[in-house]
Amino acid sequence: LWEMTDEWKYTRNYGRGQFRTDQARYYKAEKDFQVDLNGDGTIGYKLKNIESKGNKKLFQDNINGFHVRDEKGALHEIIRGSKKVKANATWQLKAAERVGGFDLVLDQNVKTKNFYLWEMTNKWKFTRNYGRGQYRTDQARYYKAEKDFKVDLNGDGTIGYKLKNIE
């Protein structure tokens, strides 16, 4: 990006050097100029739907950041510690929903299937862990969260307790 005078004469490079497709500022420039710079058919982030069962929809963008679309259609980046939350090899965001009057995000360990619930502001900024620490697959509250978020977190094919016929 170049900074120009009112007479459209070059003054200097704008920003901090080259804008790359793996940087959030690249996609901000696409939105600011309303142009698809990388030819992916989308202006701004290309979003993949992660979960869309309730009033809140969870998306992951093409540089691994997470976003929530609220019931009014507004898209919010999920922020923790002033940084955009990104996926990693161990932890993945699985769902976002309003439960019991709180906006919550479910952050799951991909190996153990245990998870934390994050309490968020209405702008989807992390405030604190919700509840009493990590939710484990041997706890009733784990299965309540499956029902609250309408997702099968442990991969058993059932939302909530898996019941066995004993008769």
Task: Indicate residue ranges for each PLM-predicted region.
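Long, low-complexity, Gly/Thr
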Residues: 1-167
